A protein has these predicted regions:
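Positively charged, low-complexity terminal tracts
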Residues: 1-120
Length: 120
């Protein structure tokens, strides 16, 4: 089964919400995140590198107001990619996905616009 590698670089978030931030300048077909990561106690930033296309996707999730300098490796399979893409699509078109809402962030320094899905 096809898998992608994801590296969690650091963790910093508010205590009451978790968010997933997607850099929409990247090809959505290569977007991936492991849903089980939501079970981890400290997650803030995940970089996913697709070596075949040389693309890098930056995601953000978290649960705690903590800063942890640590790294973990995740394996992400195609089923998990499709599940998270369905969640994002459902939220984006306004379908009910309990506990989630869509937000658009101010363009970053490099001019890309981020889409943020807040998990409350």
């Amino acid at each position: 089964m096809l898998t992608y590698n994801a590296r969690i670089e650091y963790c910093l978030d508010v205590a009451s919400i978790a968010g997933i931030i997607i850099d929409v300048s990247c090809n959505i077909e290569h977007f991936a995140i492991l849903l089980d990561a939501l079970e981890l106690q400290y997650i803030k930033k995940i970089n996913i590198k697709d070596d075949s296309s040389n693309e890098e996707i930056i995601l953000t999730i978290g649960k705690n107001a903590e800063f942890v300098v640590d790294s973990h490796e995740l394996k992400i399979n195609i089923d998990q990619i499709m599940l998270i893409k369905k969640m994002i699509f459902d939220v984006a078109i306004g379908n009910s996905f309990p506990g989630y809402h869509l937000d658009f962030e101010i363009p970053s320094e490099n001019g890309t616009i981020n889409v943020c899905i807040i998990i409350s």
